[in-house]
Amino acid sequence: MARWRVIDTGANDGAYNMAVDQVLAQGVAKSPVLRFYDWDPPAVSCGYGQRFEREVDSAVCSALGIDIVRRPTGGRAVLHWEELTYSVVCDPRDLNGGGEGVEGAHRTIA
């Protein structure tokens, strides 16, 4: 199994957080990476293909000081507020130690 890098980038705005995830996902990471981060200010991150203008009220977000950003990955809108977020970038073979599927990935990371 490859040696994992653990990165804590602290609290940053949504654009910075998504830019780091994008760079890591584009293969800049030569070894598996587990990244921890926080959001300051709070943000709504929308999935890559999501039409968020239908589901996220940008006027309310603006009034509350909540950023709206797009994730480089799929999924739905997620509100990030007073939380610790993590991302994993690796070759799927780096997760085999914990077993198959999402549960196996969580066991490997833990």
Model-derived segments and their meaning:
Residues Y16, V20, E82, I109:
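Catalytic-loop motifs flanking and including active-site residues across diverse enzymes
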Residues D8, N96-E100:
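Short coil/turn segments at secondary-structure junctions
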Residues M1-E55, A59, A63, D67-R71:
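Active-site loop/lid in soluble adenylation, ligation, and acyl-transfer enzymes
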Residues D13, E100-G101:
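Alpha-helix capping and helix-coil boundary motifs
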Residues G101-A110:
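Long, well-ordered alpha-helical scaffolding segments within enzyme catalytic domains
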Residues R54-G97:
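A glycine-rich, hydrophobic loop/mini-helix early in the fold
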